[in-house]
């Protein structure tokens, strides 16, 4: 276990301040936009963890009433955070909601559901869902208590997804007002979600004197390892950034 270094660090900082008293740049508070962007991202991270937990909880419940129904749909989440499989199980919350219907009746009902929620209808998908429901073995009965458990889990997940979508939109709006936004968005692999997150974590990039300072701030620099004639170039990253 490493010894505590709080006092030693405080002395180091004090000595550094005394040595560079005349050359240290004046502290400038963070801009309101950057501060809000950073806090939005912090909340986004927290809600993302909650969403993962709630999604796992819902899938666990569905394994007892309609196993693997979430794997029948592969549509990407919408801009408002809604997902097709979540909307589907909100209506067809038990495998018997599908298996007790003839294929023709279920197809008609599924078509009506797709039109209501704005999803594409596929007869092959209707047949696949119906076949899956016919082969499912549910552990929990089809009653009001089971329906309450599933729909409450869905309601919590939808609320969290909506909050994430709102935060993402606000982060995008805040990031777009900053001067470095066009440069960040032109980077390879950076999209509408990652771009604002990078800007939130880095802050004002103009405060770094070089690209090496930015790399060290991110904690992905490889510190030197030299002693006498030894000079190791292959090093792991420090992970000691902000």
Enumerate the predicted regions with their spans:
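A detector of single, family-specific signature residues
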Residues: 1-242
């Amino acid at each position: 276990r490493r010894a505590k270094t709080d006092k030693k660090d405080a002395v180091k900082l004090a000595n550094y301040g005394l040595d560079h008293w005349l050359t240290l740049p004046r502290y400038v508070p963070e801009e309101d936009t950057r501060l809000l962007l950073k806090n939005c991202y912090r909340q986004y991270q927290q809600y993302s963890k909650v969403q993962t937990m709630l999604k796992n909880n819902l899938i666990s419940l569905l394994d007892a009433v309609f196993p693997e129904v979430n794997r029948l749909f592969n549509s990407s989440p919408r801009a408002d955070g809604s997902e097709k499989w979540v909307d589907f199980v909100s209506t067809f919350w038990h495998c018997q909601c599908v298996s007790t219907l003839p294929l023709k009746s279920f197809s008609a009902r599924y078509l009506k559901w797709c039109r209501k929620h704005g999803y594409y209808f596929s007869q092959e998908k209707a047949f696949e869902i119906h076949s899956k429901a016919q082969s499912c073995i549910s552990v929990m009965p089809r009653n009001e208590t089971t329906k309450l458990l599933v729909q409450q889990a869905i309601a919590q997940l939808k609320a969290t997804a909506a909050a994430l979508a709102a935060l993402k939109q606000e982060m995008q709006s805040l990031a777009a007002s900053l001067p470095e936004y066009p440069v960040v968005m032109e980077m390879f692999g950076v999209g509408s979600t990652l771009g604002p997150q990078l800007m939130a974590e880095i802050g004002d990039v103009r405060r770094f004197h070089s690209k090496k300072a930015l790399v060290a701030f991110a904690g992905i620099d490889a510190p030197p390892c030299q002693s006498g004639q030894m000079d190791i170039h292959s090093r792991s990253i420090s992970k000691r950034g902000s």
